[in-house]
Amino acid sequence: MIKTIKKSNGTVVSFDPERLNKWASWADKRGIIWSEVTMEAMKRVYEGCTTKEMHQAMIDVCVDKQTQEYSDMAGRLLLGIIYKEAFGGFTKVPTLVTFVKNMERAGLWEKMDYSQEELEYLQGYIVHSKDISYGYAVLKQFRDKYGIRDIKTGRLFESPQFMFMGMAMKAFEKQPKHR
């Protein structure tokens, strides 16, 4: 029985099964029995595991089921990890202006010829909620192959929406200003 769990910031807290149930309930939008997923995931982790390991155990349970419904749940759970790694969670997604400046400052994106006004305009075309419609296989490919991440730690720095916008911005950067 798990009594403690280590949060992403390194603090050890008492394990609250209700939080696990909330993750599963949020990720299940196809009517599967998510409590089975949480119970099986609990069997796969150890006392003092990290929240990320617990989250991954839930994903692994879903992937092992090999049905579309469970794959969709795995995708939503993986998206939670992606947003946690990149931004600290779904509620902490930066604006495009802030994101671009941070990526350029960190040397992860090349400096592009866009004004703040243009970036603010492009912000209106980013719909982060679209990411939730991607299945597990798509998000796994994004995370493992295409998203910008730290080679040493594996930490991801962008979401699918920001990656797509960055590709479009780079492709059209040299176009006339009447974009």
Language model region names:
Residues M1-R179:
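Extended catalytic cores of very large enzyme megasubunits
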